[in-house]
């Protein structure tokens, strides 16, 4: 596969993909590029709206029916449920790590398996999260790039 980048200051940014057929890898790139235009609406502690790029999300957590979006420098509430966010941002590197948790695997710094089957992930901001044993096998498949069936 060839990659060619042409810089032109006069034209609006545009990405053109030429291919014989759309393979799963190419479709993933297309989906990822298209998802960049979708931002997640959040509300901060002062009830001010702000928007988060899906790539900037470290993890998403549901606590007592409220969904929180965590980035490296902000936390916000969203009206969307975990399931809605998981369905809408399937192309982002999000993984459902527990019933109440979605983690962005692009921000994982390290992993540590536990004897009880759980996996402790350390994010690049040094925060630690737990992948439940129920999701651990699927998590390993996702990291290997294998197809897996969502629970």
Predicted regions and their residues:
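N-terminal regulatory/sensing modules of transcriptional regulators
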Residues: 1-27
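Active-site-adjacent beta-strand anchor residues
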Residues: 19, 129-132
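Conserved binding/recognition cores within well-folded domains
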Residues: 25-130
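C-terminal structural segments of small proteins and small subunits
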Residues: 133, 137-138
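…primarily DNA-binding HTH/wHTH and HhH modules…
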Residues: 148-151
């Amino acid at each position: 596969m060839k990659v060619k980048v042409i810089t032109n200051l006069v034209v609006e940014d545009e990405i053109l993909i030429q291919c014989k057929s759309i393979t799963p890898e190419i479709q993933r790139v297309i989906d990822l590029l298209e998802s960049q235009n979708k931002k997640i609406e959040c509300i901060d502690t002062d009830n001010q709206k702000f928007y988060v790029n899906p790539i900037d999300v470290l993890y998403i957590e549901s606590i007592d029916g409220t969904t929180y979006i965590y980035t490296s420098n902000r936390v916000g509430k969203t009206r969307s449920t975990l399931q809605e966010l998981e369905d809408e941002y399937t192309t982002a590197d999000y993984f459902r790590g527990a019933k109440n948790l979605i983690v962005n695997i692009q921000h994982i710094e390290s992993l540590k398996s536990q004897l009880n089957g759980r996996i402790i992930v350390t994010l690049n901001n040094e925060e630690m999260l737990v992948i439940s044993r129920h999701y651990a096998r699927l998590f390993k498949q996702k990291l290997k790039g294998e197809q897996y069936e969502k629970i």
